[in-house]
A protein has these predicted regions:
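AMP-binding adenylation
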Residues: 1-150
Length: 150
């Protein structure tokens, strides 16, 4: 959106943080969207909204991982197949992510299914409800993840 014509000034809005790199993996939105499309194609389901956050220090001492919070309009036929396909799709597109998985720095992603309306309620709680406001899909921290309520 233009905010000034003299001098020219444009404000970029929307999803401007299109990456996650908490572990040096540099995963970008395009890779996430393509892997998600592959998972839906193979396992079925319809995704309403999602966000991905790193779990850097899991409580049980396990390896860190990416946690996907997904609101499904329709659940996949097999959530495990969905998760495997999603992870394999990311590894196929992003060699850094693949190296971290194979090197046992990260474990495979984990999916947390959230009820319908979770992201709408989150956006309302942030004062960002409306057509021009979008859920951030990728984050290097857990600010969104830790504020989701269900």
């Amino acid at each position: 959106m233009f905010t000034s014509l003299s001098p020219y000034r444009i404000v970029v809005t929307g999803r401007i943080k299109h990456f996650i790199s908490a572990f040096g993996e540099h995963v970008i939105a395009k890779e996430v969207e393509e892997a998600l499309a592959q998972a839906i194609s193979k396992a079925g389901g319809e995704v309403s909204e999602f966000t991905v956050a790193p779990q850097v220090n899991p409580a049980s001492g396990e390896l860190p991982y990416h946690e996907w919070f997904i609101e499904f309009e329709k659940l996949p036929e097999d959530i495990e197949t969905f998760a495997n396909t999603l992870d394999q799709g990311l590894q196929a597109q992003n060699s850094y992510y693949k190296d971290l998985i194979e090197g046992k720095i990260l474990q495979r992603l984990k999916i947390t299914c959230v009820p319908k309306g979770t992201f709408v309620e989150y956006m309302k709680s942030q004062g960002k409800f409306g057509g021009q406001n979008k859920v951030q899909h990728l984050s290097n921290d857990r600010k969104i993840a830790d504020n989701l309520k269900w």
